[in-house]
Amino acid sequence: MDLNIKKDLASNWFKLLQNAICDDIIKLEKNKLKFKSTTWKRNKDKDEGGGEYRIIKDGKIFEKVGVNFSKVHGKFPIQFQNKIPGASKDPRFWASGISVVMHMKNPRIPAMHFNTRYICTTQNWFGGGMDVTPSSKDINEKKKFHKTLKSMCDRHYKNYYKKYKKWCDEYFYLPHRNEARGIGGIFFDYKKKDFEKDFKFVRDVGVTFQMIFNDIIKRKIKKKWTLKDKEMQYIKRGRYTEFNLLYDRGTKFGLQTGGNVEGILMSLPPIAKWK
């Protein structure tokens, strides 16, 4: 398959998914809120692509939710070329992706994160994942979440869940705190063996995330909470902020490749606290 066709298939899917997820969010908010949409360009002087990020704040369900789509191309800075597969041979790249971060008003509903991407250098691969960060323990929620992920992964390859869960546990970890960011999920990168199979998996990850966030919110939206619960949520958001600014690959990649700063930092919670 021609590389340009692969790029179009991937970026068109990410854009379609952005629209579908935003539609779901609006429905959950009873059609009473609209997204604030911002389009951006990677380079003001020449065409290097860009994207669109959409944000809702202060909803009945979502305290802040961001849904970002991007499709960019250009050259990696010299200091970044040895860190990206294939970039040392040729610094030119093309990348497209979608990222979603949900911070909830009700602290009994966990924060949720999802992203998938397709990156092309002299090599081409998919990456992404999803994870959930509750501010209070819910063992049944954790079991249900991971059962859904395992079922999805098993549709493609029996080893995926074990491999990508382990990768997620290792990735979403704060070494300076010696603690996990949340209850895990799946994380994958450098999927490049078979475009059609990998793309099918990536699409399934997106659809499964849609199903998961709708299910969690609808089951927990009427759960009562206290000010103590909210304070715990703010503290947990502090940990979330630490991870995103210190360790997150997507944040580093975006900032070092001329991405839109507001779009990159949309993942940060509206309010966070530290003890």
State what each model feature region is.
Residues 80-82, 141, 197, 252-258:
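Short conserved micro-motifs at the rims of enzyme active sites and ligand-binding pockets
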Residues 104, 251-275:
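Long, contiguous binding/interaction regions
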Residues 6, 104-106, 122, 132-139, ...:
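A generic structural motif
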Residues 152-201, 216-218:
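Long, charged, mostly alpha-helical binding arms that flank functional sites
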Residues 51-128:
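Internal mixed beta-strand/loop scaffold within catalytic domains of large alpha/beta enzymes
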Residues 94-96, 125-133, 179-193, 240-242:
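Glycine-rich, often proline-containing surface loops adjacent to acidic residues and nearby aromatics
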Residues 2-85, 191-246:
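Gly/Pro-rich turn-and-neighbor structural signature
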Residues 122-166:
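Compact, glycine/acidic-enriched structural inserts
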